[in-house]
Amino acid sequence: MTSSAAAIPARRRPGRPRAGDTVPDREQLLEAAVRIIRSDGPEVTMDDVAAAAGVSKPIVYRNIGDKDALVAALAERFVDQLDEAVERSSAVGVGGRATFVASMRAAFEVIDADRNLFLFVTAGGPGTESVRRLVDRSSSRMIEQFTALRTAAGLDPLPARTWAYATVGAIQVVASMWLRDGYGDRDDIAEHITQLMWPGLTTAE
């Protein structure tokens, strides 16, 4: 074997980092995905995410999974944002209708501020795993709150689960149409949803 032949480096396998490269971890890859979605819109591809992270697509797949796994992971993050905002809005301790409408306003504020991420995680529709998980997490707190509200008022708590799902569904669909058509003020939209939902929550009929 000649010295020149011995100097030829081993070929790097696809998806493997170059020598000396630092491979982003899963959290850093998710951050890169969020950045590119926020800047380029909800139609970004896995190739776009890889480019934003400065890695090959196989590295993204190895650390996150496929597109569905990415959507599911970012849906969890988005629900965390919603939960934090709604919890802050409820911490004022006013209670009743004022707290309900404040939570609706908080949800729409988060959606408005991060609209591309919202559209990305809800793009698959209600039949997708990511949206089902989003609904389950978003509604769990409402089920507890609606049950407590009805019980404290001496009313049947049975409808609480249905109304929680209905409220989450209303937020999702109304927000999608609002972002698409740009109609109305977000606080007015929150008030409109409250006008529809609140009477059922607080009456026996």
Where do the model's predicted regions map?
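Amphipathic alpha-helical packing segments from all-alpha helical-bundle domains
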Residues: 128-152, 161-165, 188-191, 198
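Alpha-helical DNA-contacting segments of helix-turn-helix folds
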Residues: 24, 37, 71-78, 121, ...
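Short hydrophobic/aromatic patch on the recognition helix
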Residues: 54-64
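Hydrophobic alpha-helical connector segments
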Residues: 73, 87-113, 163, 167, ...
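Basic, helix-initiating cap at the start of DNA-binding domains
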Residues: 1-52, 68-72
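Amphipathic alpha-helical segments used for helix-helix packing
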Residues: 108-130, 144-147, 176
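Short hydrophobic clusters on alpha-helical segments that form packing/core surfaces
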Residues: 29-37, 78, 82, 107
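C-terminal peripheral helix-coil segments that are non-catalytic and often amphipathic
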Residues: 1-13, 144-151, 177-205
